[in-house]
From Swiss-Prot:
GO cellular component: cytosol
Keyword annotations: Amino-acid biosynthesis, Aromatic amino acid biosynthesis, NADP, Oxidoreductase
Highest taxon of the lineage: Bacteria
Pfam families reported in the protein's UniProt record: SDH_C, Shikimate_dh_N
Catalytic residue list: 72 (proton acceptor)
Residues that bind NADP(+): 84, 133-137, 228, 251
Family membership: Belongs to the shikimate dehydrogenase family.
E.C. no: 1.1.1.25
Gene3D superfamilies recorded: Leucine Dehydrogenase, chain A, domain 1, NAD(P)-binding Rossmann-like Domain
Name of the protein described by the UniProt record: Shikimate dehydrogenase (NADP(+))
Residues that coordinate or bind shikimate: 22-24, 68, 93, 108, 230
Keyword Amino-acid biosynthesis applies: yes
Length: 290
């Protein structure tokens, strides 16, 4: 990143590691082309994100970044200003890079919430919601659900007990939701309370340990599983839930809706219904070929 990008073209991108399977460039570049927007979206694969790296992006004319694993919590700390979700939950998946300041946003929660409302709104009413994992995605999702007014109870199950407790404390402090950290062993004994399972860890992702996070007999036909892993769509966890008759929300839906919000933040143009339909079709086709 030694030279500035073409300044007549607005340049955005994604930062994370690894990124070889990311579909974000397909999403953003396709909409730019559809809308005749003079912009490009690049891939910046890096294991380190710090102040110096942000300055490199700024010097190169990069105006905005999608942030993914493992940098979401780091991204928040590098921003000068942040939206409520980022500020409260201490994780961001979007950075806008201005001449002098960096702004952090979190569109993960909004993306997940839209997906749930579209595919399984009843799952927010009939029982408790459990989030599996306590990383950057889990933080954004937990906050958006907590402030939605749609749930009263939230469980967070993570192998990292410290971050699970932190998420629950932040949710309880900043909403009317009762949030409770829970171990996997205890969760297995309380499965009848659960209506919605949201899986946010890398387990099942291509190139990662397959999992599943929960055994097959955890699920039943009254549950909904939302595994935010989208490559592959049918993870071992999804297959286990399907076998038990649970409803499935595709992980690609969160990718779709969080990207639509990022597109709006990057371009100041609101996505329309046609953008969503076309993007969903492109994602489906791309995932079929993987």
């Amino acid at each position: 990143m030694k030279t500035k990008t073409n300044q007549s073209v607005k340049t955005f991108g994604i930062v994370g590691f690894p990124l070889s399977h990311s579909l974000s460039p397909l999403i953003h570049n396709s909409i730019y082309k559809d809308r005749n927007i003079n912009a490009s979206y690049l891939v910046f694969e890096t294991q380190n994100l710090n102040v110096e790296k942000i300055q490199e992006f700024r010097n190169s004319g990069i105006l905005g970044l999608s942030v993914t694993i493992p940098h979401k919590e780091t991204a928040f700390t590098l921003a000068d200003k942040a939206d409520d979700t980022s500020r409260i939950m201490k994780a961001s998946n979007t950075l806008l890079i201005g001449p002098d300041s960096t702004y952090a946003y979190n569109t993960d929660g909004e993306g997940a919430y839209h997906s749930i409302l579209e595919f399984s709104p009843e799952s927010l009413k009939t029982g408790k919601v459990v989030i599996l994992g306590s990383g950057g995605s889990a933080r954004g999702i937990a906050f958006s659900l907590a402030v939605s007014g749609k749930i009263q109870n939230l469980l967070v199950c993570s192998r990292n007990e410290i971050t699970a407790k932190e998420i629950c404390l932040l949710v309880t402090k900043n909403s009317n939701v009762k949030a409770e950290p829970i171990s996997q062993d205890v969760l297995l004994t309380r499965k009848e309370e659960i209506s919605l399972v949201i899986h946010t860890t890398p387990l099942g992702m291509k190139g990662q340990s397959p999992g599943p996070y929960l055994p097959e007999d955890f699920f039943n036909s009254n549950m909904t599983l939302f595994d935010i892993v989208y490559n592959p769509l049918e993870t071992p966890l999804v297959k286990a839930a399907q076998k038990a008759g649970a409803k499935i929300i595709p992980g690609s839906e969160m990718l779709l809706y969080q990207a639509m919000k990022q597109f709006e933040l990057f371009t100041e143009i609101s996505p329309n219904a046609e953008d969503i339909i076309k993007t969903r079709e492109r994602l489906s086709k791309a995932l079929e070929n993987r």
